[in-house]
Amino acid sequence: MAGGGKHTPTPKAIIHQKFGAKASYTVEEVHDSSQSGCLGLAIPQKGPCLYRCHLQLPEFSVVSNVFKKKKDSEQSAAELALDKLGIRPQNDDLTVDEARDEIVGRIKYIFSDEFLSAEHPLGAHLRAALRRDGERCGSVPVSVIATVDAKINSRCKIINPSVESDPFLAISYVMKAAAKLADYIVASPHGLRRKNAYPSEIVEALATHVSDSLHSREVAAVYIPCIDEEVVELDTLYISSNRHYLDSIAERLGLKDGNQVMISRMFGKASCGSECRLYSEIPKKYLDNSSDASGTSNEDSSHIVKSRNARASYICGQDIHGDAILASVGYRWKSDDLDYDDVTVNSFYRICCGMSPNGIYKISRQAVIAAQLPFAFTTKSNWRGPLPREILGLFCHQHRLAEPILSSSTAPVKSLSDIFRSHKKLKVSGVDDANENLSRQKEDTPGLGHGFRCEVKIFTKSQDLVLECSPRKFYEKENDAIQNASLKALLWFSKFFADLDVDGEQSCDTDDDQDTKSSSPNVFAAPPILQKEHSSESKNTNVLSAEKRVQSITNGSVVSICYSLSLAVDPEYSSDGESPREDNESNEEMESEYSANCESSVELIESNEEIEFEVGTGSMNPHIESEVTQMTVGEYASFRMTPPDAAEALILAVGSDTVRIRSLLSERPCLNYNILLLGVKGPSEERMEAAFFKPPLSKQRVEYALKHIRESSASTLVDFGCGSGSLLDSLLDYPTSLQTIIGVDISPKGLARAAKMLHVKLNKEACNVKSATLYDGSILEFDSRLHDVDIGTCLEVIEHMEEDQACEFGEKVLSLFHPKLLIVSTPNYEFNTILQRSTPETQEENNSEPQLPKFRNHDHKFEWTREQFNQWASKLGKRHNYSVEFSGVGGSGEVEPGFASQIAIFRREASSVENVAESSMQPYKVIWEWKKEDVEKKKTDL
């Protein structure tokens, strides 16, 4: 979407704006077995997958029809829900006068006999108001009507969009509407009640349904002082079934009654998942002149600014004045019972943490101290936690921004097949420079064919542009472009939360600042700095660990660790920061005392039995990552550091005993880290190669094989270890002399994918191929049906076997299968040093022995150097009367360390081959078979 004009919200976006996290979508797969994805496939297969969506809202649920796409089923369910709610997307087209009239009509209906027994939360408030005593009997606080009733609140926003952030405006519009119902409604300065009493039979009937389950109850809440210097404290509310809970809250705030209490929107979550609200005093300016919310004097404005509660306003996104109480208590749909949950100081800090992109990620990973929002999205398989697009949507919802608009586009990009030719020589010592140059070129022009870009635009609810993010990079997959653009936007927003988010020295992504722009720096306001509850003296991070070693785990690896973090007072320092006195006579006594003090001054704040993260993307606390990358699997490490001031809010967000943690934070504490490295998965072979080669090595290998197929005029081809059929599928994209293609593999899943791809292409495209067959079998077994073919291929397969099995395959394929031409490729182990950057400069500085590079894939059983590969192929060819030619793809054979993927071409020299009876040995099972004559016959029959 170009420009900043209005866009029509989708049904799902409207549901999200109305209900947020309370709207739960569950999509189920519906398989259509009546249709077949691939005729002739011997493996049991599912039909096309369809989707049905179940949408659960607080008061009801709906089920969509069946659709081919998940998103269509979700939109359908949302549309059904809107119909059931009576919400019309065109409500935004209402005029201000029409909105005012609808508020009047809605208030009249709320105080009708019919609505008194409604299952709406406001109905429960009305019934509770009838149990109030004295002049308050039947009086409903005006803030309840303005906040709890969604229809009234939405109409108030039509009158003035500022209602979104200023709830007091909604109160004024409700009071103005009530003034037009003087014959029906009695309006006090703070509440509304019906002029004529409800019929006695209705009231008596309702009285019999009052729950006795809540006689009196203490509910934990959080008291947030207006003055920033004062500490946020745990508080207690006393609520009961015979008293309106707002009167109890008013009592704690020092107010006359609940009519003077302002209620915020729902936000955040308490310990058990219930959402919270803020309760505060309606500013006197509004109490004294509630019928007119405009035209404040300078004196009034000054008072309101001074009374604004910055911390409370920040966590709910609305203007809160005076002291406030954070609580989870209120009425829900379809219930007369008061719903409540304890809210702790820990809950308050978790809500604060969850307002930022980094905090959302931390909480979702259940690692508030250890985890960090990554600064790079590499692959979906390596990403842990919610995806960037999901986090961005949640962030926008929390800050009352419109749904992000993501627009993907494709564009042709030029080839980079000559990248290596531009570098005369690649040396191990020049790895970093080479990587930097190649990476820079890769970002601008990612490869042959088409690439994807994604643009993100974020608007306010009133359609003011907040952020436009247009990354220049292209990506091979559309989802990668979407996730990277979303992450860019999140990183831009993260700059506003530096004081809340940063754990020590966190790197920032500043390479693409030119990709993002904002129409005004004031559109999105930075959050208030949380008051440092202790000394504001700067704290330097000191990691006390063993001497720094060489990094042994490469970037792109996914590691699994077990860790625990504890807060402890350093026994070497007294509370005033001075070293303890030395007294030889009392050393033993002091040592015992320090040991006891240390033991009693340790608080476990966070632990995780197993968590995974990708190295080199900033997804983990830098101190943890730095230590882990120097470890080996099974190794245990521990170290300590002094937490920076910015980490105090995070520590309070995870600690269970806030009082004790605050006490420790005042005693110059340190963070004790204990880490066990459970496992390491190296960066994927595809990713490492993609960082250096465009087009990818896999495509270069296919092109190399095609060249020899054309030169040999082969008519039959067998792909040994065909996997998902990528080579066979690619062969159909080019004109060749091939008439018969065969694939062999031991993976039924891979063969099924191959069959589906080949089935589609062979039936749609005109080509010379007359037959195609896929076999389930081991290439270590001989099958006479594959004897004496024109060409055999075995690309990047043998390294997945044991080394002796690879040698066995070589013997059998040349002695029994006896192809005229055989192409075998395997990784060049010597090239791994460049791909993995496994020789950092610090090795020379530390005079340590160079580390051996790792295999390119965790599934590889071995990888050969050029010498090993040459010896294997040469001896094999000599024994079986084959000439051998060596080549490769990726890089150059004339410079060190040779080709990235080394290739041997075996050519049969003997003109005559012994005949083998076709039925003599046939261990392979036919999984799928296609014949051109069968297809043509069916067409003729039709």
Curated annotation (Swiss-Prot):
It comes from the Eukaryota. Mg(2+) binds at E796, E799, H800, H860. Its EC number is 2.1.1.386. Signal peptide: none annotated. It is found in: Nucleus. The lineage of its organism: Eukaryota, Viridiplantae, Streptophyta, Embryophyta, Tracheophyta. Changing Y109A: No effect on RNA binding and transferase activity. Changing D719N: In hen1-2; alters organ development and floral determinacy. Disruption phenotype: Reduced organ size, altered rosette leaf shape and increased number of coflorescences. Urydilation of miRNA 3'-ends. It catalyses: small RNA 3'-end nucleotide + S-adenosyl-L-methionine = small RNA 3'-end 2'-O-methylnucleotide + S-adenosyl-L-homocysteine + H(+). The keyword Glycoprotein does not apply. Binds 1 Mg(2+) ion per subunit. GO terms for biological process: leaf proximal/distal pattern formation; leaf vascular tissue pattern formation; miRNA processing; miRNA-mediated gene silencing by mRNA destabilization; regulation of flower development; RNA methylation; RNAi-mediated antiviral immune response; specification of floral organ identity. The gene is HEN1. Methyltransferase that adds a methyl group to the ribose of the last nucleotide of small RNAs (sRNAs). This protects the 3'-end of sRNAs from uridylation activity and subsequent degradation. Can methylate 3'-end of microRNAs (miRNAs), small interfering RNAs (siRNas) and trans-acting small interfering RNAs (ta-siRNAs). Involved in plant development through its role in small RNAs processing. Required for the specification of reproductive organ identities and the probable repression of A class genes. One of its GO terms (cellular component) is cytoplasm. Residues 93-204 form the HTH La-type RNA-binding domain. Keywords: Magnesium, Metal-binding, Methyltransferase, Nucleus, RNA-binding, RNA-mediated gene silencing, S-adenosyl-L-methionine, Transferase. Residues 505-514 have a biased composition (Acidic residues). Expressed in stems, leaves and inflorescences. Its main location: nucleus. Binds small RNA duplexes as monomer. InterPro entries: DSRM_2, Hen1, HEN1_dsRBD2, Hen1_Lam_C, La_HTH, Methyltranfer_dom, PPIase_dom_sf, SAM-dependent_MTases_sf. One of its GO terms (molecular function) is small RNA 2'-O-methyltransferase activity. Changing E799A: Loss of transferase activity. S-adenosyl-L-methionine binds at S726, D745, S778, I779, L795. This is Small RNA 2'-O-methyltransferase. PANTHER family: HEN1 (PTHR21404), SMALL RNA 2'-O-METHYLTRANSFERASE (PTHR21404:SF3).
